[in-house]
Swiss-Prot record:
Organism: Crotalus durissus durissus (Central American rattlesnake)
Pro-peptide region(s): 19-24
PANTHER family attached to this UniProt entry: KALLIKREIN-1 (PTHR24271:SF47), KALLIKREIN-RELATED (PTHR24271)
Family: Belongs to the peptidase S1 family. Snake venom subfamily.
Coiled-coil regions, chain positions: none
Sugar attachment sites: 125, 158
InterPro entries associated with the record: Peptidase_S1_PA, Peptidase_S1_PA_chymotrypsin, Peptidase_S1A, Trypsin_dom, TRYPSIN_HIS, TRYPSIN_SER
One Pfam family this sequence matches: Trypsin
EC number: 3.4.21.-
Protein name as annotated: Snake venom serine protease
Molecular function GO labels: serine-type endopeptidase activity; toxin activity
Keyword tags: Disulfide bond, Glycoprotein, Hemostasis impairing toxin, Hydrolase, Protease, Secreted, Serine protease, Signal, Toxin, Zymogen
Disulfide bonds: 31-167, 50-66, 102-260, 146-214, 178-193, 204-229
Amino acid sequence: MVLIRVLANLLILQLSYAQKSSELVIGGDECNINEHRSLALVYITSGFLCGGTLINKEWVLTAAHCDRGDILVLLGVHRLKDVQTGVSKDVQTRVAKEKFICPNRKKDDEKDKDIMLIRMDSPVNISTHIAPLSLPSNPPSVGSVCRIMGWGAITSPNVTLPGVPHCADINIFDYEVCRAAKPELPVTSRTLCAGILEGGKGSCDGDSGGPLICNGEIQGIVSWGGDICAQPREPEPYTKVFDYTEWIQSIIAGNTDATCPP
């Protein structure tokens, strides 16, 4: 019954969530059905939609600003219509049993420490279209080509929604490139700067919480951006997962009092 309600709401969200969500993939193409096995669809029952990343059978990584109500996690999703009609047999749905946000996060700043761990109510089964993604062993270097993916808008500011996840390749830049485009960013930050300087490709409304993948590891989390997506000379900041690996591993190990780096 819960899944039926979720799928019905997803139909409504296809028409309405652009006004309520935060980031999507612009300038990409439909992802290959086999390349997004770790991509989670994070549905918040208040009507907000995010992406997420499966990092082991029981845990999903997403953005802290996606914490806007009770959460359902769908894995193995490709074409939303197939899920809604029951054609897709590889989809698994889980309830968020626990949610963990950095206890030292600034409560009045959604951009601060924008990372959240979701523990699902039961482990997922690894399958053809569901598998976890590795945490980073090292941070990505400037110039790296990385992959973003999600169900977010594919045009901006006039929103077009795809119904399938879209993927795009973007580049890692020095953090100062993002600071030049967004002076409100702090002098130092635990974020990655990524995008295309010419514009035309990037995350946008609806992709929040989704992954920035470099060399088969989750290196970033879609966090926030401008009013119009994928603008020239305006790469976007992504939460830098490498800086939070110790916190992530501590929480998963049962140390729920662990704090994030300042």
